Amino acid sequence: MLWTWVRIPPPPPNIMKKILLLLILLLMPGNIYASAPVIKGLNILKVAKKDLAQVGHWKRTPTVVICEHAPIERDNVREAITWWNKRGYIFYHSIYLRGSRSTETCNNPDPTGYITINLVTQETFEAGDNLAVTHFYVDNDTREIHWAKIYLKSNVEERVLEHEFGHALGWMHTEKVGHLMNEKLIYGGWGDAGLKKH
């Protein structure tokens, strides 16, 4: 039997880059972003991830509280609040860092009127590739959000806090590529279609 060796030239550089990018995307863990928000009070609700959906709204203007061990700086929180301000959402500008009011609010299981930012604990977080989780309470009859608790891992990636504020404002995940509320960090972006307050 006679063997003939044929040499195949390597693909052009632009094709090689696309192949490498595809391989990287396929090998990355799929859920590197945030776990689905934990909604308390609201009856079970099916929301299609393809469509952006808001399951609740704030009647009162929420106050943001940075809890004692939260892995985020005050300036980062201000930037995230400003991002949402530009889309029509209002927050009280008081951001408590220390003191009895902050501790009391952060330890309250029902911090009505507040969005708290905390470091994750074993009770609030599932193991895996998730970067953050938000718990919030929605009144079943009025769809009013009473409170929200954002839990962050110690290494906060870009866009994660803005994404979690989206959950604190009642927004669910979407599959839209490039959108802030996309569940996966690699497919998300700063897109805000549908997020502007009317």
Feature annotation, model-predicted:
Residues I19-M28:
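Sec-dependent N-terminal signal peptides
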Residues T63-E73, K149-V156, I186-W190:
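Second-shell loop/turn segments in exported
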Residues T4-V6:
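Short, positively charged low-complexity motifs
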Residues G30-I72, I81, N85-K86, V133-T142:
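Disordered inhibitory propeptide/activation segment of secreted metzincin zinc metalloprotease zymogens
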Residues R74-A168, M172:
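Metzincin-family zinc-dependent endopeptidase catalytic domain
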Residues K153-H198:
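The catalytic-center signature of Zn2+-dependent metalloproteases
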